């Protein structure tokens, strides 16, 4: 159907279906409602995976709670049916846009294998109860076909949870439990088929005291299966062919399961180490370097303490590398939500454009300083400014002991040194010693990054320079005369640059004109040489050459006037 046809159909729809659509909205496959529905479907699927097999292999369990099983069976069937309805109301992405047209959703769903599996899982095989009796739960094995829905729920949870590694381990343990559970059920069913107590391998005769209880039957079977699959204990030797086949199958399953478990655990551990390496610096390399270079123990202890502080307090120093795979705009939004409030406290950045602050936020570099470490010293060249995120810094004298002031969270320093303010008496050098009292977390903004951003915002640059001038005036650090001299020098330099630009433009124009004249002269000479060659060899000259030559040199043709002009110009030239 065309787009126009869709519009007409929507407009002609009566109010009743519109109201129905409100009650049955289209779900976003990445939304919360769809996620929680997937988690709801975990329960009926796990019920069928665990209980149905157990009921089929342990007759006492099936007979003792028949009514409860019927209630749970048809409750799970109802959820299966509702799940198909949810699938008919779950949108999908097409060219990045969520499709909410229910006709398109239904058409797409019924053409997938998922729809066929969902239908097969709801085939009413229970109708055979009428002929075979209600104690054959194996008729419900087709409910296992809904297992892909379980895997989808696990994948979504692993993506959303804050502890993905713990969830992976829990999921692996669940798989191990299901495998051992199924194996124990098959072991008990095989023992019943071969005869209880016929040899040491099968389940003991229920006539013995204690072995007739259902709980003992299941726990014994589960224990026996655990011994076989984990190969950690002695088990009775098989005696019959069926027992040998069962043991061989279990041993093969144990080998494959052991490889799977080891691979999964290795993957989890590797992911944990990779995450730590991405968030925190690798201290092992630094420790090895210090050992090879014979760094003194005191300095080595400080370095180790710094790494330990980062690890214990979850401090990150490489946010750029962590967020590098995000799209630029999304990375900017994350950085803005984390750091914009801190940057807004800086006086020279107040009332600046929001887009400017967003770009500056991406340039902030987190740094952590140890107790007693100098952030900057008096006289150092200032190439960056600092914003205190957490901790305390002291303005100290040259002796490093006398404190003039203490700077806390939210304060900043060094902002004047990264802005080129004319007349700044201190230039771009530090005017104080700043030392960290404890562990301090700072944000660093370099002069190069600020200059790069301000190149796109000249108006904001002028506003910042004006604010910097006001700050310097209050501090009596602004030389007005020097500022005027620098401004005059800058204006003179700009005037000279404009003059040079104008001269350069004139030279380029003259060069282009001369180049055009040179090309024209070369073309005329080429035509003349070719014409002389034809005349020298007394060949009949082509008409097009004569016409082209006449057009190129109207004063030097074959006419008498042309010959006279040529002779006047220099008769010996042709000779």
Swiss-Prot record:
One Gene Ontology term, aspect cellular component: perikaryon
Segments of this protein annotated with the region Selectivity filter: 231-234
UniProt activity-regulation remark: Ca(2+)-calmodulin exerts its inhibitory effect in cAMP sensitivity by binding to IQ-like motif of CNGA4 and preferably binds to the channel in the closed state. Inhibition by PIP3 of the CNG channel probably occurs via CGNA2 binding. Ca(2+) currents are inhibited by pimozide, an L-type Ca(2+) channel blocker.
Site description Central gate, residues in chain: 258
Sequence segments annotated as region (Cyclic nucleotide-binding domain): 354-474
Keyword hit for Iron-sulfur: no
SUPFAM superfamilies xrefs: cAMP-binding domain-like, Voltage-gated potassium channels
Entry comment on modification after translation: N-glycosylated.
Location of the region described as C-linker in the Swiss-Prot/TrEMBL record: 274-350
Protein residues bound to 3',5'-cyclic AMP: 430-431
Subunit structure: The olfactory cyclic nucleotide-gated channel is an heterotetramer composed of CNGA2, CNGA4 and CNGB1b subunits with 2:1:1 stoichiometry. May form homomeric channels gated by nitric oxide.
Physiological role: Pore-forming subunit of the olfactory cyclic nucleotide-gated channel. Operates in the cilia of olfactory sensory neurons where chemical stimulation of the odorant is converted to an electrical signal. Mediates odorant-induced cAMP-dependent Ca(2+) influx triggering neuron depolarization. The rise of intracellular Ca(2+) levels potentiates the olfactory response by activating Ca(2+)-dependent Cl(-) channels, but it also serves as a negative feedback signal to desensitize the channel for rapid adaptation to odorants.
Entry domain remark: The C-terminal coiled-coil domain mediates trimerization of CNGA subunits.
Protein name (database record): Cyclic nucleotide-gated channel alpha-4
Organism: Rattus norvegicus
Gene for this chain: Cnga4
């Amino acid at each position: 159907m065309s787009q126009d046809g869709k519009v007409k159909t929507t407009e002609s729809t009566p109010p009743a279906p519109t109201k129905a659509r409100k009650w049955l909205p289209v779900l976003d496959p990445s939304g919360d409602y769809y996620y929680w529905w997937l988690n709801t479907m975990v329960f009926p699927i796990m019920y069928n995976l665990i209980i149905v097999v157990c009921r089929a292999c342990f007759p006492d369990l099936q007979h003792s709670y028949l009514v409860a099983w019927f209630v749970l069976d048809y409750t799970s069937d109802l959820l299966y049916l509702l799940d198909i309805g949810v699938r008919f109301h779950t949108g999908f992405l097409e060219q990045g846009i969520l499709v909410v047209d229910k006709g398109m959703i239904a058409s797409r769903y019924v053409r997938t294998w998922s729809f066929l599996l969902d239908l097969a899982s709801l085939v009413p095989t229970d109708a055979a109860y009428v002929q075979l009796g209600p104690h054959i739960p194996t008729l419900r094995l087709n409910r296992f076909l809904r297992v892909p829905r379980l895997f989808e729920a696990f994948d979504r949870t692993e993506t959303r949870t804050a502890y993905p590694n713990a969830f992976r381990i829990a999921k692996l343990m669940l798989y191990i439990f299901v495998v051992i559970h199924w194996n124990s059920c098959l072991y008990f069913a095989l023992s019943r088929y071969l005869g209880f107590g016929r040899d040491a391998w099968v389940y003991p005769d229920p006539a013995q005291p204690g072995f007739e209880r259902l709980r003992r039957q299941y726990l014994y079977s589960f224990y026996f299966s655990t011994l076989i699959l984990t190969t950690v204990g002695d088990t009775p030797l098989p005696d019959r062919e069926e027992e040998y086949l069962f043991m061989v199958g279990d041993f093969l399953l144990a080998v494959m399961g052991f490889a799977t478990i080891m691979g999964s655990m290795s993957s989890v551990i590797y992911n944990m180490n990779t995450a730590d390496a991405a968030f925190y610096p690798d201290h092992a390399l630094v420790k090895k370097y210090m050992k090879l270079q014979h760094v003194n123990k005191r300095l080595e202890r400080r370095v180790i303490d710094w790494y330990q502080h980062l690890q214990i307090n979850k401090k990150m120093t490489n946010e750029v590398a962590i967020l590098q795979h995000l799209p630029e705009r999304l990375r900017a939004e994350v950085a803005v939500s984390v750091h914009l409030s801190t940057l807004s406290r800086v006086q020279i950045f107040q009332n600046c454009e929001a887009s400017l602050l967003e770009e500056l936020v991406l340039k902030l570099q987190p740094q952590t300083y140890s107790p007693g470490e100098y952030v900057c010293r008096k006289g150092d060249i200032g190439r960056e400014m600092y914003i205190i995120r957490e901790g305390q810094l002291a303005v100290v004298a040259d002796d490093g002991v006398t404190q003039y002031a203490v700077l806390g969270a939210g304060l900043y320093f060094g902002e004047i040194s990264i802005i080129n303010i004319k007349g700044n008496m201190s230039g771009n050098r530090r005017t104080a010693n700043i030392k960290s009292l404890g562990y301090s977390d700072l944000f660093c903004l370099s002069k190069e990054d600020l200059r790069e951003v301000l190149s796109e915002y000249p108006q904001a640059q002028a506003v910042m320079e004006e604010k910097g001038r006001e700050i310097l005036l209050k501090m009596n650090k602004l030389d007005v005369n020097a500022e005027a001299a620098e401004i005059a020098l800058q204006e003179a330099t700009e005037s000279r640059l404009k003059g040079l630009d104008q001269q350069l433009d004139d030279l380029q124009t003259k060069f282009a004109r001369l180049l055009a004249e040179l090309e024209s002269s070369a073309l005329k000479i080429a035509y003349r040489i070719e014409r002389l060659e034809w005349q020298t060899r007394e060949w009949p000259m082509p008409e097009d050459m004569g016409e082209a030559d006449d057009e190129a040199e109207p004063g030097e043709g074959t006419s008498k006037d042309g010959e006279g002009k040529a002779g006047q110009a220099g008769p010996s030239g042709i000779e």
